[in-house]
Amino acid sequence: MSHGHGGGAADNGVSPGNVPVCYYGAAGRVPAALERRVRAAELFMRCAACGLAVLAAALLGADRQTRTIFSVEKTARFTDMQSLVFLVIANGMAACYSLLQGARCLVSILTGGVLINRPMAWAIFSCDQVMAYFTITAVAVAMEAAMIGKYGSLQFQWMNTCHFYKRFCAQAGGAVACAVAASLNMVGISLVSAFNLFRLYGSGKGRK
């Protein structure tokens, strides 16, 4: 009886190497409902991170204000602060990366693909970790510069530039807020990729 069942599986082109199974824990299988939720959550967070990163980069890239100060016309741009340039670059990279990974998630959902193997899971997990730390670092640097621009620094005798460029600072603040939200999504994505990676080790499956 066992032999007949194996023969039928072979005839249908199904083998242990191509059956789409997902394992979690010592000997358990992830319920189908949970699997769908995890995939949907990952897709949503990657799309949200992409959109927020694009919005942050666009707001900063288009941010400029011209004022006349002491009879001298000056224009404030994001390129005047290296921290904002770094933030634009980081969000541009995060947007491109999230778009590619989001497309992979969408294809996986639509095709019901087999769970990725360990090397691929490690690669995705590592890239997600790098992007999460990268975006958080860029946000932290930009927020520090924004605080100096808003409140100045008595120790270094740096003046409050936002007093002169209120619209520029307001738009830059909105861009930083979007970047913060994008970085938080990247952190959530790294947690999901960690779940997808380490569950492959629970049952001894998915080694290759």
UniProtKB/Swiss-Prot annotation:
Keyword Amino-acid biosynthesis assigned: no
Membrane topology annotation: Multi-pass membrane protein
Listed InterPro entries: CASP/CASPL (IPR006459), CASP_dom (IPR006702)
One Pfam family this sequence matches: CASP_dom
Extracellular side: 61-82, 150-174
UniProt main location, coarse: membrane
Organism domain of life: Eukaryota
Membrane side Cytoplasmic: residue ranges: 1-39, 104-128, 196-208
Keywords per UniProt: Cell membrane, Membrane, Transmembrane, Transmembrane helix
Transmembrane residue ranges: 40-60, 83-103, 129-149, 175-195
Localization, UniProt: Cell membrane
GO CC annotations, alphabetized: plasma membrane
Similarity section: Belongs to the Casparian strip membrane proteins (CASP) family.
Subunit structure comment from the entry: Homodimer and heterodimers.
Protein's name in the database: CASP-like protein 2U2
